[in-house]
Amino acid sequence: MAILTDWPWRHWASQTPQSISLNEPVALIADETRWSWQALARQVDCLVHHFTQQGVTADSTVALRGKNSVQMLFSYLALLQCGARVLPLNPQLPDAVTEALLPSLSVTHGLCLNDNPWPNAVRPLSLAPISLPSGSLLSDDIEERCRADLRWQADRLATLTLTSGSSGMPKAVAHTFAAHLSSAEGVVRMMAFSASDSWLLSLPLFHVSGQGIVWRWLATGATIVVRAHQPLDSALRDCTHASLVPTQLWRLLSEDILPAALKAVLLGGAMIPQALTQQAEARGVSCWCGYGLTELASTACAKRADGRSGVGLPLHGREIRLVDDEILLRGSTLAAGYWRDGKLIPLVDDDGWFHTRDRGRFAEGEWHILGRLDNQFFSGGEGIQPENIEAVLLTHPDVQQACVVPVEDVEFGHRPVAVVELAQTTTLDAVRDWLQPQLAGFQRPVAYYALPTELKNGGIKLSRQQVKSWVKAIYPSSNRSLSAAGR
């Protein structure tokens, strides 16, 4: 990886030819348009000028709301170059959450790419048109001023990324540029991602995994591909690397539409069947999986997928230990803190360890993540870790998402309920019948519900707290008595 002394896009622009010809570096493929690093850097400078004219400074905190697009990517880079702390937001985040959250994060400006209004205290920004990658966008004197503005500082705060909020209101995790780049270094070493490769921006920028793709691209001078409105097989054209969930890879293989250029995938979001990775590897696609979290700027541990439940070993720059069954992490990818009320709140103990609240163990040469310490509940004296039930559910080929939460029960204290998102090819009854023999009696859900649209928040992870509240509101009160069905 390069040693950066300037903004990454400027660094790579200084290293590569201005025009794009066969076999020369391409920075960005947006649909079918190819951008050189020079053209990309000029477009970023143009947007920096546009945003600074609207009052964005190095002291600003800017919320950036929208789905993945070339406009979203350029805005992200330009706001970083302005020196602002950039907070990418899920466009499906409820208004009530946004209105409660943004004032506490001292958000000064907001750029919305989906026309939703901002709370009154947030000054809305407009976006200049993204020009085609040719010609000069700024006069020479303005371009020179852009270059003379804020200088690259790797240890400066760059981004605020919301946690999933799975147990309540999301927290804003603050990362420096250096932390993002260190996170990228571990993954690109593992997956042999280099300047001659390309990665599809398949995950949202409001999630740390989506930003991880961007920083791997910036760290290596490779190509990023943005095709947000195309089917997956079309979007993957020209891509050597991709971040996928198992159901996406299954479809590419089963429909025989796996792109020829694809050579490595980072899998997440569900259990990964060995049969899937064996098929992919037979087609020349290496499969990787692991364990990541927002506070560690994405991936903390990883390995070549092998059908076993472990998550491998810590990547370069990360350390891991186990204390009272809890996973603790530290390293160069760790966030600077949680951002609230205009300041950083520490997230580590006196020795620099972050307490994840994840249960874990080390066995057979790798780490295993057993679930959240605060998710466990008891039913008739038996401890239930909902992630264990979810893991079995997610091995069903037609289960796309699953969340298991407790409901109160007079006799047993609590019982599990499953909320699942299914493909149209199966039913809740069929999934229940399939699951029953695979679980102990106390683990079997007493009810199954289809995941409602309002809980599909567009993120990588469902909010367990929201699912729990929704189930509590609809679960029959009679089922909380001794006559509860399904026992």
Task: Identify what each model region corresponds to.
Residues 377, 403-409, 417-421, 431-487:
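Conserved C-terminal "lid"/linker of ANL adenylate-forming enzymes
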